[in-house]
């Protein structure tokens, strides 16, 4: 088990995360700072076969892990926390597409049971974040978390909004 503590309430007991999860429950919200987002737009109209592989090979070559990734027909957005080899990575990415970079981002992760038959939880999270510009969303790879990318300057607002929307009922007990 892992105990997550509340940075806004350091004396609070926090939340224990273990393998016993109540169906449809939301357990915790966590944040990871110092994230850099890279967007690659294909030079072709649609992503060619093997395009994603080429992108991932570049990151692998420079031993840089990817935290989040989203794709469309013509673009890939991904986030990293290690920028030590960013200049070299960008040079190679520019050979296969148009590249833009956003710095000072935060991944906000909502942990819970988001099984496909759970209804309403994702909309509660999105409604809570309606006051914050969301740059990217990763959902579906795991039934246990949804990750959102926001600017670091919006982190506090996002965490407070999620806490109020998702856990306010716990404080009333």
Feature roles, as predicted:
Residues 1-141, 145-173:
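C-terminal catalytic "cap/lid" subdomain
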């Amino acid at each position: 088990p892992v105990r997550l503590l509340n940075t806004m309430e350091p004396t609070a007991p926090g939340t224990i995360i273990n393998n016993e999860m109540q169906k449809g429950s939301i357990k915790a919200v966590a944040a990871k700072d110092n994230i850099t987002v890279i967007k690659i737009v294909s030079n072709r109209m649609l992503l060619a076969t093997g395009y994603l592989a080429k992108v991932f090979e570049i990151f692998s070559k420079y031993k840089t892990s990817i935290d989040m990734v989203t794709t469309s027909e013509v673009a890939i957005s991904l986030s990293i926390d290690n920028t030590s080899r960013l200049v070299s990575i960008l040079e190679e990415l520019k050979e296969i597409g148009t590249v833009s970079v956003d710095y000072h981002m935060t991944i906000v992760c909502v942990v819970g049971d988001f099984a496909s038959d759970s209804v309403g939880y994702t909309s509660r999270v999105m409604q809570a974040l309606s006051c914050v510009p969301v740059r990217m969303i990763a959902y579906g790879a795991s039934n246990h978390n949804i990750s959102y990318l926001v600017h670091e300057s919006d982190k506090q607002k996002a965490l407070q909004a999620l806490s109020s929307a998702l856990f306010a009922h716990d404080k009333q007990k």
